[in-house]
């Protein structure tokens, strides 16, 4: 099967919005090449990138989406063009260049593996690609992953912020809802910290990948993975609700927290680009939640919130 790769060069501030356009088109694969993020891992010493040479810090990212070359290709390209034009009108400094080429499915489905290496997150997590060998320390909690075409390798700031916060927050036998589980990395991390996790995703590919990773990590007894939205899949209330998605989707989820989160529960919201943090904070406040903690990394924000006493 052939796929049309569309590469959009955009300022780092606009990568989330462009990626969202691709997701709206139903792209099964979206990648973000962010030189500043790459440089941060080189400087941390946790990731070996010597094979890739010097990294040029341009202040821009390349967001790539993959669209099947079938009868829907041209309508989707027109929809993408309209979306990019709308972004240009609102943020003329964002979209700089758009390129397209045809690639074979096996090329884009596996080429990213060259960039995914073992990496340490927080105090104890060691993220290990399934095809890599590592020598763990006795205290390491190994998260073995093959993310395939699902979001979540742990290397992006949004995911690493969540992992660090889970390590600080999760207690044994907590009940956790992971909304938009992607590769399942956050659910697996929480399970290895002793929690019982219900992970959901709208994307059937993500659900399949997450289930495979759950089995790979031998935590199937602590995690259930299901396809659907929180309104139709989740029952009862959780001690902790985690959503590493994007700001607009988080804002849509907030009104449902009253139903799915316990009175003494907490909400972790990540995937929030810096300039949208105030919108999410306002949305939380409007629905009776107070922000306990705000973390930032590489222009991305995580918010930890709980119910205000007066709202219960």
Curated annotation (Swiss-Prot):
InterPro entries in alphabetical order: Ribosomal_L11_MeTrfase_PrmA (IPR050078), Ribosomal_PrmA_MeTrfase (IPR004498), SAM-dependent_MTases_sf (IPR029063)
EC number: 2.1.1.-
Catalytic reaction annotation: L-lysyl-[protein] + 3 S-adenosyl-L-methionine = N(6),N(6),N(6)-trimethyl-L-lysyl-[protein] + 3 S-adenosyl-L-homocysteine + 3 H(+)
GO MF: protein-lysine N-methyltransferase activity
Keyword Kinase assigned: no
Main location: cytoplasm
Pfam families given in the database record: PrmA
Subcellular location: Cytoplasm
Binding site for S-adenosyl-L-methionine: 159, 180, 201, 244
Biological process terms in GO annotation: methylation
Cellular component terms (Gene Ontology): cytoplasm
Keywords (A to Z) from UniProt: Cytoplasm, Methyltransferase, S-adenosyl-L-methionine, Transferase
tRNA-binding among keywords: no
Top-rank EC class of the record's enzyme: transferase
Signal peptide: none
PANTHER family assigned to the protein according to its UniProt record, in alphabetical order: ELECTRON TRANSFER FLAVOPROTEIN BETA SUBUNIT LYSINE METHYLTRANSFERASE
Annotated family: Belongs to the methyltransferase superfamily. PrmA family.
Function description: Methylates ribosomal protein L11.
Descriptive protein name: Ribosomal protein L11 methyltransferase
Source species: Desulfitobacterium hafniense (strain Y51)
